[in-house]
């Protein structure tokens, strides 16, 4: 055994002893308060338990492996529909309490006292439909997390799912702790580990994890204005060459460095035209009232959402298909104490109940959507009567675009319409009082200002980014100015009422 392996084993053993001691200390009272480490646990549990369960795919008749099951907050709920639940925890008194609570009611639960990091834990490959873990990985060191995820992927059947929920950045519960060995990581650590995990079956087929969704737990945002409770749902899929639109956004158009350089141009918190200036102008048109609920489609890194929540005391749900965008948004939310939650979601497949939102807001995002009429029908359904939609978006002039502009549209994967047609699509979806304004003159002024500021501050830009980044911005803005000045590229503002 080499020196590195010996050191890793020693650190691993110390980590397990520390974590076991911590949870033995906090498991003396086998209550929901001690498990959640919060004096308001009963109220939080009432809010968050249905929210968490609603994120899961159907588990009716399925095999569910619950890691870190505790005293069974979720065990009984899972057992109501699952074919078989394997509930596992590494504290003996805790799993016995779980069995005492749920064992007589549900005969489809197997209770196990085991440490998820132990090589002695044997779960058959391709035997589990869903792995469910609520507050577990934060009690493992980085190496243990990586090894466990690798094992979980093997345990899962193809098409199976992993749900994890972790406290990130800092603690949430108010329980006093003599020591706290919890690893409060940035969410991007978990995202990276899951995205980089691969496994192979006996036939040599390669499998990876595809993100279904990632979001803040809304119950904590509402009750504590705390965005650090993050969950992820992943699906085990066969590796393919075509990684889909989400991978395109995160690896091509909205890479982390690309997002940061966009923010440098648009202003802190913003990745859409005009930054704070246009956000304030447009949001002020909505006549927002305290307590209203806003859906931001294509929320980016959250600047507009923070502005709405902090200025008007509304609750904002920001969704974006880009994992990178949402990761930045969540990081920027920490410490702001505002009622904003974020979720990685595809607006074309996401479903909300009818009459959920007072306002739906979207800035320079719907240009990516090919079937706008279907999306606008959903917007109409999701809005409350009297609710408003506000959209700014790239548009084009009527008629056939030039070869150069057509190539740009194709390369970006955009679906662009003229301003009048765009407004008509909103009318056809059922909206009234549709305002469809050509804001291209404003677009040109903003582009000129942003380009001028970038060129003026070239030295500062190059201190943080590369020459290639600088050239991409300058060339991109110059090209937009050229297309818009020629009358080909347009910018529209649309406001409509249900």
Swiss-Prot record:
Enzyme class: transferase
Induction (record text): Induction by cold stress, salt stress and abscisic acid (ABA).
Pathway: Phospholipid metabolism; phosphatidylcholine biosynthesis; phosphocholine from phosphoethanolamine: step 1/1
Known EC number: 2.1.1.103
Gene field: PEAMT1
Organism expressing this protein natively: Triticum aestivum
Protein role: Involved in phosphocholine biosynthesis. Catalyzes the N-methylation of phosphoethanolamine, phosphomonomethylethanolamine and phosphodimethylethanolamine, the three methylation steps required to convert phosphoethanolamine to phosphocholine (PC).
GO biological process: methylation; phosphatidylcholine biosynthetic process
Residue sites binding S-adenosyl-L-homocysteine per the record: 68, 73, 89, 115-116, 134, 271-272, 298, 320, 346-347, 363
Single GO MF annotation: phosphoethanolamine N-methyltransferase activity
InterPro entries (UniProt xref): Methyltranfer_dom, Methyltransf_25, Phosphoethanolamine_N-MeTrfase, SAM-dependent_MTases_sf
Protein's UniProt name: Phosphoethanolamine N-methyltransferase 1
């Amino acid at each position: 055994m080499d020196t590195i392996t010996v050191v890793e084993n020693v650190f691993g053993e110390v980590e397990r002893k520390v974590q076991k001691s911590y949870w033995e200390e906090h498991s003396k009272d086998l209550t929901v308060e001690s498990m959640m480490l919060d004096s308001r646990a009963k109220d939080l549990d009432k809010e968050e338990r249905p929210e968490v369960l609603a994120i899961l795919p159907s588990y009716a008749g399925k095999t569910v492996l619950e890691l870190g099951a505790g005293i069974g907050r979720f065990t009984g709920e899972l057992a109501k529909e699952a074919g078989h639940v394997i509930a596992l925890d590494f504290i003996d008194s805790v799993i016995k309490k779980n069995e005492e609570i749920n064992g007589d009611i549900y005969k489809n639960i197997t209770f196990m006292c085991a440490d998820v990091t132990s090589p002695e834990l044997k779960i058959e490959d391709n035997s589990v439909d869903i792995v469910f873990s609520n507050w577990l990985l934060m009690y493992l060191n980085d190496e243990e997390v990586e090894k466990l995820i690798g094992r979980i992927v093997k345990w899962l059947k193809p098409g199976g799912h992993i749900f994890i929920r972790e406290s990130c950045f800092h603690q949430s519960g108010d329980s006093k702790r003599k020591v706290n060995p919890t690893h409060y990581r940035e969410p991007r650590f978990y995202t990276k580990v899951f995205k980089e995990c691969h496994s192979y079956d006996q036939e040599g087929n390669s499998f990876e994890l595809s993100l279904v969704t990632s979001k803040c737990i809304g119950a904590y945002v509402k009750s504590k204005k705390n965005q650090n409770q993050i969950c992820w749902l992943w699906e085990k899929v066969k590796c393919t060459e075509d990684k889909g639109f989400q991978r395109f956004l995160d690896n091509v158009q909205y890479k982390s460095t690309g997002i940061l350089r966009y923010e440098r141009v648009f202003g802190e918190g913003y990745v859409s035209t005009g930054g704070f200036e246009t956000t304030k102008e447009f949001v002020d048109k909505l006549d927002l009232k305290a307590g209203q609920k806003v859906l931001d489609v294509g929320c980016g890194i959250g600047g507009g959402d923070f502005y709405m929540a902090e200025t008007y005391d509304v609750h904002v749900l920001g969704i974006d298909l880009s994992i990178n965008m949402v990761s930045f948004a969540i990081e920027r939310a920490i410490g702001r104490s505002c009622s904003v939650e974020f979720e990685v979601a595809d607006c074309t497949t996401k479903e909300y109940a009818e009459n959920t939102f007072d306002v739906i807001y979207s800035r320079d995002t719907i240009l990516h959507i090919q079937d706008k009429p279907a999306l606008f029908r959903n917007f109409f359904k999701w809005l409350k009567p009297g609710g408003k939609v506000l959209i700014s978006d790239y548009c084009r002039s009527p008629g056939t675009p030039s070869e150069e502009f057509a190539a740009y549209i194709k390369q970006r994967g955009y679906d662009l319409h003229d301003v009048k047609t765009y407004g008509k699509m909103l009318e056809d979806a059922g909206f009234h009082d549709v305002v469809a304004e050509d804001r291209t003159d404003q677009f040109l002024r903003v582009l000129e200002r942003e380009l001028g500021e970038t060129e003026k501050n070239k030295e500062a830009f190059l201190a943080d980014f590369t020459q290639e980044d600088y050239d991409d911005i300058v060339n991109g803005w110059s090209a937009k100015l050229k297309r818009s000045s020629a009358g080909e590229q347009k910018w529209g503002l649309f406001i409509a009422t249900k």
